[in-house]
């Protein structure tokens, strides 16, 4: 028995020592850089939100956190930010995600202060086909959301993208990606709106 | 002394020409195809690989006399994974945009076979100086090919290099070049070119 243990350590002492040393190295690096990594993430979200709500918004505060249901039993953590300008609420922004064509799509969606109208969305992360699906980030597709009602949106294949209403015209050749964005916004917007009304953070009028 | 200098020279030349990773060894092909849609991500990827290659070569070279043959691959992977994690954290902290573009391909350097090949072939058999030189030259050789491939693809798919417009405005971008098919076609043509050039030399 003792011999077996001795043999084990003879063979593997280097591995044990090295694992410990390398583990320590990673822990130190991670401790040194993780604040910066967190800061980068917040900065990125803040930049996107500012772009979506400018010039109305001056600052953002994290107001609520919510687990949004993606599919049965699958949840994603959502941060809801309140945009303030001149001491008044100028709107809300939240992150949303869901399945895209090739990979998941992560969005930041901005709405006005009563959750009546969407003010816009932007991609935090996406991996759609270059030249086709990745045009969800560009006008005219993206611009259709600015001013659209914050309710159930519907994707149509034929229509005028200039008309701002609940009908979103798909990018030709990228129906799946177009549908994915609509689904993600529909899914999280409706759940978040309900949550906000329940909490009394926005009026029940909408 | 002369013998030592010869070994150094041989090591450097091996990485840059005679055993240049993509053309001669045919190693590290996955990132070659995946991150060469534009020059900036390709260069970032190349520099990360150079860092990991040099660091893991140093680590392996230092412990080469202690290695047990049946545990060596485990030790190589351990060292490589550590330095890849550090490189990944570094990019996330200081180059967040590039980190977002490269996505999972930075952690995937762990399974990049050039690095484990150099640990096995060179670092576990040679001293510190040769290992460092080998890491640098193999990494540089790989990065040069990567950037070359990426500049061809970026030029044809967007008309830009490093994000700067170089093609005339009348140029119609070839979207296919930024997709996987463009990577395969360009790489295939480059390999053919490399082989025909190599043949003439010998």
For the regions a language model picked out, list residue spans one by one:
Chain A
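Flexible, solvent-exposed loop/hinge segments and secondary-structure transition points
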Residues: 2-206
């Amino acid at each position: 028995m003792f011999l077996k243990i001795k043999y084990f350590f003879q063979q593997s002492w280097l591995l044990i020592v090295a694992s410990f040393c390398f583990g320590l190295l990673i822990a130190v690096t991670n401790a040194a850089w993780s604040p910066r990594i967190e800061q980068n993430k917040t900065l990125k979200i803040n930049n996107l939100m500012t772009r979506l709500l400018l010039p109305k918004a001056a600052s953002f505060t994290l107001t609520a956190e919510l687990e949004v249901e993606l599919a049965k039993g699958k949840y994603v953590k959502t941060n809801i930010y309140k945009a303030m300008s001149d001491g008044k609420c100028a709107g809300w922004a939240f992150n949303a995600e869901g399945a895209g064509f090739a990979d998941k799509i992560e969005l930041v969606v901005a709405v006005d202060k009563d959750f009546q109208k969407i003010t816009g969305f932007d991609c935090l992360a996406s991996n759609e086909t270059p030249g086709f699906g990745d045009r969800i980030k560009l006008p005219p597709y993206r611009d259709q959301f600015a001013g659209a009602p914050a309710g159930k949106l519907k994707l149509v294949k034929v229509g005028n993208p200039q008309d701002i209403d609940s009908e979103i015209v798909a990018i030709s050749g990228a129906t799946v990606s177009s549908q994915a964005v609509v689904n993600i916004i529909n899914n999280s917007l409706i759940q978040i709106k309900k949550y906000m009304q329940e909490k009394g953070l926005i009026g029940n009028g909408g | 002394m002369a013998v030592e200098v010869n070994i150094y020279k041989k090591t450097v030349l091996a990485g840059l020409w005679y055993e240049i990773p993509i053309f001669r060894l045919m190693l590290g092909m996955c990132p070659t195809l995946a991150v060469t849609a534009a020059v900036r991500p390709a260069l970032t990827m190349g520099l990360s690989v150079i860092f990991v290659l040099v660091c893991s070569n140093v680590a392996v070279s230092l412990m080469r006399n202690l290695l047990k043959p049946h545990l060596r691959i485990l030790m190589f992977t351990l060292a490589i994974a550590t330095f890849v994690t550090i490189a990944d954290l570094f990019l996330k902290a200081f180059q967040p945009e590039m980190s977002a573009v490269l996505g999972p391909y930075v952690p995937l350097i762990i399974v990049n076979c050039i690095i484990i090949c150099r640990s096995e072939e060179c670092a576990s058999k040679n001293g510190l100086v040769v290992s460092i030189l080998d890491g640098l030259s193999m990494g540089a050789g790989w990065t040069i090919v990567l950037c070359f491939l990426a500049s061809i693809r970026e030029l044809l798919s967007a008309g830009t290099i490093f994000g700067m417009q170089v093609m005339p405005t009348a140029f119609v971008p070839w979207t296919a070049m930024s997709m996987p098919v463009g990577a395969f076609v360009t790489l295939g043509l480059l390999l053919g070119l490399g082989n025909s050039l190599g043949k003439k030399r010998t």
